[in-house]
Every structure is written in structure tokens, then in C-alpha cells.
Amino acid sequence: MSKLSQPASTAGVNGISVIHTQAHASGLQQVPQLVPAGPGGGGKAVPPSKQSKKSSPMDRNSDEYRQRRERNNMAVKKSRLKSKQKAQDTLQRVNQLKEENERLEAKIKLLTKELSVLKDLFLEHAHNLADNVQPISTETTVANSDNTGQ
């Protein structure tokens, strides 16, 4: 097993010291800690990533600045085109669904009418059958069964 080395302290910006430690042999990585440098240091601890961005303001006339602006402008254009295309696709889908909905509603009306016609035909046929059948009295049925049994 290896031992942890002693923490090394480096003076930072705004009176903040950064304490660096080395990880032991298990491969764990430790993150640098931000600690105020002294009792009168004042201010809040700022992560190193934020410090580096604010420490060097970019010259607006530099090539790097112009390249960044150009890349940013292209990214903005691309994002806006993508957003516009998505809105158009959504609108097209809405219109397709509206048309499909209208077709389905028309089909429902047609099938409802067809069902009504078929019900009417069925009921009419059932009434015609009932009118054509003569009621059989129980006396006639008993007499017929006696005659057939001889």
C-alpha cells in the first residue's frame, strides 16, 4: 500500500489557497479544495474553471474573438432553422391528424346509418314472421298428440 502524500498548498486568486492532494494507489481521484487563504482573505471561494474565464477578457478585434462569434452565429442559425423545421413538421402532422379525424367521423356517420337501416330491416322481418304465424291453442296440440299416438 502506498501512503498519501502531504497536501500541497498553492496561493490562488482573491486570497484563496487551493489545497492539492494525491490519491492513493486505489485509483480514487480527489478534487482540489478551495480554502480561504487567511483570516482577512474575504470574498467567496471561486472554482478554478470560473476564475480562468473571467481572468482574461477577450479583445473584440482579435481573430479568436471573431472566430468564436462566427461559430456562435452559425450555431444560432442552425438552432433557429432546426426549431423552425420542427414547428413546420408539427403543423404538418396536426393537419394530417385533422384530415384523418374528419375521414373517421364520416365513416362513423356512414356506419351508424347502415346499422340503423339493418336494425329496421331486422325488426320489419321479425314482425312479418310474427304476423304469418298463427297461434296454436293448447287444446289443438293435445288432440293432435292423441291422434298421432294411436
Swiss-Prot record:
Binds DNA as a dimer and can form stable heterodimers with CEBPA and CEBPB. Interacts with ZNF638; this interaction increases transcriptional activation. Residues 66-93 are annotated as: Basic motif. GO terms for cellular component: nucleus; RNA polymerase II transcription regulator complex. Belongs to the bZIP family. C/EBP subfamily. The keyword Nucleus applies. It comes from Rattus norvegicus (Rat). It comes from the Eukaryota. One of its GO terms (biological process) is B cell differentiation. This is CCAAT/enhancer-binding protein gamma. Residues 56-72 have a biased composition (Basic and acidic residues). Pfam families: bZIP_2 (PF07716).
